Every structure is written in C-alpha cells, then in structure tokens.
Amino acid sequence: MSAPREDADVETSSEGYARRFAGPVGRFFLERQAEATLALLRPFPGASVLDVGGGHGQVTGPLVDAGHDVTVLGSDASCEARVREWTGPGRARFVSSDLLAPSLPGRSFDVALSYRLLPHVSRWPDLVAALCRLARRAVVVDYPTRRSVNAVADLFFGLKKGVEGNTRPFTVFSDAEVEEAFAAHGFAPTGRRPQFFFPMALHRGLGSAGLARGLEGAASALGLTRALGSPVILRLERRG
C-alpha cells in the first residue's frame, strides 16, 4: 500500500493560515523572516528559486522584488490562490506537483527553498531528498529547533492552540539531525539565522508589535537569539 500524498501546504496556503500573520505582530514576523531570507540569498543574486510548499506567499514578494526568478510549487492547484498576485501578471510561476517527488528536472533551480513545511511532513527525509535533487547550488529551509522553548513543545501545545486557534502539531528537530539529513545528499550548512528567542505564541498573545520588537531586540543584543532562537532558517550549499 502506497503512502498517502503529502499535502501539508494546502493548510499553509489557506486564508485561515494567513490570518495568523495579519496585523502588526504578524507583519513583524514576516518582516524578520524576509530579512533573514534575503540575507542568506545574498551570495546568489538573481537566482532561480523554487519555493516548495510556498503557496502561503510569505516570501514570494520579497524574493521577486529582490530580483530573483521565483517558481512556487504546491501539492494542489488551490495552493496558487495566495500567490496569484505575482503569478497572474507573470512576475512568478506556479506549478502543481507531488511535494516529495516533484516532476521537475534535477538541479533545475539555483536554490530550493521551503518554509512552514518540514515540521509538518511525516516523511520529512523524503522532502530533504527532493529539495537536494532540485537545487543546483543551495537549499534554504526553516525548522523549529530543540535548542529553544520548543524542546517542551508538547507541554505547551494546548496553550499555543488557545492563543493561535488553528495551530497544528509539528515535529521539533535537533540541529544535528537536520544537518545530517542534508549531508547524506552532499549539502553542508553555510548560514544559520534563528528568528525569535521568545515563543511566537507569546508575542501573538501580548498583541504588541512594539513590545515584540523590543523584547527580540534585547534578546538579540544579549546573544540569546543566536544561541536559543527558533525557528531556524538554515542555508546549506552543495559540496562537490
């Protein structure tokens, strides 16, 4: 019996999911994510980027505006809805295919990127393999790390769901297991950007972008975010 098709991006491409990032606090989250992403892509100006599971559209605009050639891959045609602002006028492209076995040639993009997906895919090593197959130069992914409050994620899941409403269970990774999975395909880490020291659910619950900026600014200045921040955005480059 074949494994069920992975479609976690259908949820992250929905309007309901987008509402989690609405308002000033949500915009702060997305700004921080975009800044980290563009910094990690700085060695690859004008790169062709495949955003696997990127129907959430969180980085489509920043990538396009920075001059990258963007293709969004979704598991279903419905995942295009939130990126049609860019795909409609031809500023980006959308393709629908199996997330774990995309019908695209190997090494056909400079960079394969995937956010909001790795922790929600049951066969995540297969996603890693797919990203590595498609990337000519680098892969960029995000993941919740155990080097943070996520180490006790199960204990706080009920509280998190109470604040966020539509949160889902997710896999928390050690940095080593993510790096080892990519190493098996010839990729090594070359850039790491932990995003938040304090839980995102806490910032949502407090509801103040100004306070969130202040707290995270202080944590960054003290080196806490670098040591214990999550989710981590990781860049890995092909070796050999």
Question: Which role fits each region the language model picked out?
Answer:
Residues K160-E177:
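Acceptor-substrate binding/catalytic loop of class I
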Residues P125-A138:
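A short glycine-rich, Lys/Arg-flanked "PGG" loop and its adjoining helix->strand segment in the class I
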